[in-house]
Structure formats: C-alpha cells, structure tokens
Amino acid sequence: MSSSTSPYELKDLKNSSTEVHAAEQENEIEYFETDSNDRPSQQPHLDYEQHNTSAVRRFLDSFKRADQDQEQEAEVAQMNDLTSAISPSSRQAHELEKDETTDKIAPHTGHKSDSLKKTIQPRHVLMIALGTGIGTGLLVGNGTALVHAGPAGLLIGYAIMGSILYCIIQACGEMALVYSNLTGGYNAYPSFLVDDGFGFAVAWVYCLQWLCVCPLELVTASMTIKYWTTSVNPDVFVIIFYVLVITINIFGARGYAEAEFFFNCCKILMMTGFFILGIIIDVGGAGNDGYIGGKYWHEPGAFNGVHAIDRFKGVVATLVTAAFAFGGSEFIAITTAEQSNPRKAIPGAAKQMIYRILFLFLATIIIVGFLVPYNSDQLLGSSGGGTKASPYVIAIASHGVRVAPHFVNAVILLSVLSMANSSFYSSARLFLTLSEQGYAPKIFSYIDRAGRPLIAMCVSALFAVIAFCAASPKEDQVFTWLLAISGLSQLFTWTAICLSHIRFRRAMKVQGRSLGELGFKSQTGVWGSIYSCIMMILILIGQFWVAIAPIGEGKLDAQAFFENYLAMPILIVLYVGYKMWNKDWKLFIRADKIDLTSHRQIFDEELIKQEDDEYRERLRTGPYWRRVLAFWC
C-alpha cells in the first residue's frame, strides 16, 4: 500500500476486508454439513448478498426484523401511509404519491418495489381518486337501502350525505394543510384538539372499520359470483380471493399502479356506460319492456312504507349505507394537501367531489330507481327467494338486455377485490399507527426488512377469516353487520374531523391567532363543520331509533339492534375504558390549552395575500377559457 493512500481509502479497504471475512464465516456455517467438494470457491471480491444467497433465502430473510437503518426507512414509509388507511382506493393513490416522492430523496435500497415507485404518474393518482367510493356500498349495499327506503328515499339519503361530505372535505383540507407532517393524520387530530380519550376510541374504531371491510368485500365477492353460478360452495371462491389478497400483500404487486389504473378505468367506464344505457332502456330504446319512465316511482312507489314515519325511518337507514359508500372520500383532501400547490389544488378537489357526488352517485342512483322496483326479490335485503345481485346488474338484466349485465357484474367483482386488497393493506398499517401513537401494544410495530408490518398483517389475516361465513344461510345478516360497523365507524371519523376543526378554530380565536396563518381556509368555514357535526349526531340518533325499532314490525329486536348499532357500544367501551385506565375524566381540552405550534405549518399571511393577488391578476389578463376552467375546476 502506498503512503499516499488517504484515510478514507484505508477505511474503505478495512470495511471491505471485514465484509469479506464475514461472508467467509457465513459460508463456513452454511456449508458446514455439506461435502467439501460442493463448497464453492471463495472469491473475496464477489458481493455475497447478490451472488451467494438464493432468491428463496433472500425472501425468507425479508421477514426478519429490519436493522436500525432499514427500520427507520420503513417507519418513515409507514408513517407516510398511516393517513392512507382511509379509503381503499384513495389510500393507494396517496401511497403511490408518497412513494414517488420518497424515491427521489432516498437512496436505492435494492427492494423490488423500487421500480414500482419510479413508474407512478399523475394519471394513476387522478384515476384512483376518481374511482374512490365505487365499491360495495354503492354497487351492492344500495340494494338493501333501496328495499328499505324506496328510490326517492335512497336519493334523498345520498343527497343529504353528499352535502355533509362537501363540508367535511373543506374542513379536512384546511386541517391537512396545516398539519401535513403530523403522525397519524386526521386520526390524530382529536387527541390534541378535543380529548385524548376520544382520539383513542375513534382511532381504534377506525381501525376496526377497515378490519371489517376486508371480510365484507370477500363476502361481497362471493355474492357477486352467485349471479353466474350457485352450484359451487361460496367458500371456495372466498378461499381463492383470500389467498389472492394475502399473496399480493406479502409479495407486493410490481404493476400495482397500472392495475389500479385499469380497475378504476373499468369502474368509471362502467358507471358512464350504465348511465347512458340506463337512459336508453328507460325511454324504450333497448330491452323488452318498452317505455318505462317513472313507472316504478308510482307502483310500487317512490318510498317504502305506508305511513310517513316508516318512510322517514327508511331514509334514516339509508344514510349509513351512503356513509359507507362515500367512505374514504375525505382522503382526497389529504392527498391534495401534499401536491406542489395545495392552496389551489384543495378548492379543485372540493369541486371534483361535487361532480363525483352528482354524476357518479346521484345520477346513477336515479337510473337505478327508474329501472328497479324496491320490492324486487333479487335485491339484497328483500324477503324474496331470488338470487341476490347488485341493483346495477338487476337494472339491466331484468329488462332483457343480455350481455351488458355480465360485464357490469365482472367490473363489480374487480371493484370489491380491489377494495379487499386495499382494506387489508390499510388495517395492518393502522395497527402500526396505533402502536406508534402508544394506543396499541408495541408488538404491532414490528417491521420486517421488506417494510411490512408483519404482526399487524397476521392479525388482519386472522380477522378476514370471518369471510368464510359466505356459505352460511346467515350470509346476508353477516353482510349487514359488517356494513353497519363500517358505516357507523365512518360517521365517527367524520364527526371527529369536524369536531377537531371546530376546536381548532376556537383555539385560534381564544389564543389570538390570525386565520391568515392558514394556507387554506375552509370555504364553508367553521359553520360548515358545525352543520356536519350536528347532522351526523342526528344521524347517529336516528340510526339508534332504527336499531331499537327496526323497519317493518317496529318491535324491539336485540339482533336487529346489534346489526345496526354495534359500533356505538364498542366506541363507548373504548372511551370509558381509556378514561378509567388513565384516571383522566376531563371531557375536552380547554381552548387556551390547545397546542397550536407543535407539528403545525404556519404560513406567511402577507406572502399568501400577494400570491392570491397575482393569481387573480393572471386570470383577469389571461384568456377567457382559463377563467372558465378556474371557475369549474
């Protein structure tokens, strides 16, 4: 070695020698019991990890606990995902965005998922965001809602929930921008803005929600298959879908972005095609029934129920299904808050939400109401003995159209499997989040070398076994239970977001802070959150009424109560249990004691005003089409 060798070169050579020595020792151990002639010749300059370790060994080693550096990287990735436990489809959009950003600043780790991170494009994020909500609640759960409420009641329920959702998107956008780096996302807001016990209870119920969604989607998938065949045991299909979901989450999916892009394109095209074909069938241009018009709004009627109280009860019951169908939409605001210009993107996301509510939800629900009577024995939740199917399939098949129903049913199957995969992913990450926040045992924070929360995934897989009830004659009841838990849990999450926003604005006022510090102010203001909070409390009260006096007989039924209201007792037990354990009985954090500095991004009020003035000037002096685009988009 020459005397001119630098200390850095000496250090590198020492490290290289150490690595080679370690590799030789490991080779000694590995081939200790093998014939000496089988032992490969030692080549000190070969990379042991790459050349001497088989793919199977690397795969098995990936389940070992990550070392300190890997664990830190994995935890960063998991914390980027913890707000993504919201909507299955939107959650994946956020994950992909975060992965793309992380890949630009993080060193190459050698993971096979790196190539996926580099392929994420805006078109993936856009289509995944548009496809949010087109799943079990809308495509299958609406069958039960139509039976209970009738076509007009179903439409009213979705319209009410849509108005609430718009205010929630505004509040969530404001909070997401100022707390964009907060561990736990919007699940963490109540812990420091409302009350720690309330935050604990809501976070656990939210985790329970996504635990329930996975078996719910698997059951729905088996029910969807019944449209084609009823001779095969449904559990056979559940096994296939169950193994598929777990396999994807163990190995990942190299082409996940393109797959989700494909799935969501299919959903959007299906909903658009259904709307057009539905209009053609309704006016007599296709099918065997000629002109239909609003026939089913007159016979059997627009509402289900003889008395006004029964009709009102049907609308109330519809609201939970609508909440589940809209579930995860609030995450669009979270994703938008992390784009390059969130102050302009969040209002656009709110407008996008209006269009989704109007065209993908309300418009197609109107068509379903025109083409499917609420007393059809094929609807889920009906008392008839017909084969249960999606109301979207029934709307086409019952009028003599042959090929299209199979395409619609196939897209529905893809939709529910996509959501099953996403919900499994989310529930495991939520367990990790709870552990990081101190709300769950530390064992759930185990992260392997591939960045998977392995213990949490095992719990999620065990919970998904509930789906094997698909062959039971009580399948419809289990579906109703899981749907009610998920729907009510979504209402709790939305209530927590709105209540946190109200308390945040109150603390800003009490502590004399200017709203100009906010990068984006909710267009509906604090009154929008108050409206949403009041409406959701009324919905919870109404759902309690429906639970103790079910639609139909109106008699108290314990089974019907737990089918419709199981999530509320769970929330109460978690809240009271936390208070008893910590001996902390305060109801809320006082506004003057709320911490408004930690984790919060404070914007320059003068700079924001200058940016807004410049933006308005560019619109004023720019072409007319740009002003039109800014108004509508």
Swiss-Prot record:
It is a multi-pass membrane protein. Pfam families: AA_permease. Residues 1-52, 81-116 are annotated as: Disordered. It is found in: Cell membrane. Its main location: membrane. A lipid is attached at C633 (S-palmitoyl cysteine). InterPro entries: AA-permease/SLC12A_dom (IPR004841), Amino_acid_permease_CS (IPR004840), Amino_acid_permease_fungi (IPR004762), APC_YAT (IPR050524). One of its GO terms (cellular component) is plasma membrane. The keyword Transmembrane applies. Residues 92-116 have a biased composition (Basic and acidic residues). Residues 146-148, 219-231, 282-313, 374-392, 474-477, 553-557 are extracellular. Residues 1-124, 170-197, 253-260, 335-352, 414-452, 499-531, 579-633 are cytoplasmic. Coiled coil: none annotated. Keywords: Amino-acid transport, Cell membrane, Lipoprotein, Membrane, Palmitate, Transmembrane, Transmembrane helix, Transport. Residues 81-91 have a biased composition (Polar residues). Belongs to the amino acid-polyamine-organocation (APC) superfamily. YAT (TC 2.A.3.10) family. This is General amino acid permease AGP1. It comes from Saccharomyces uvarum (strain ATCC 76518 / CBS 7001 / CLIB 283 / NBRC 10550 / MCYC 623 / NCYC 2669 / NRRL Y-11845). The gene is AGP1.
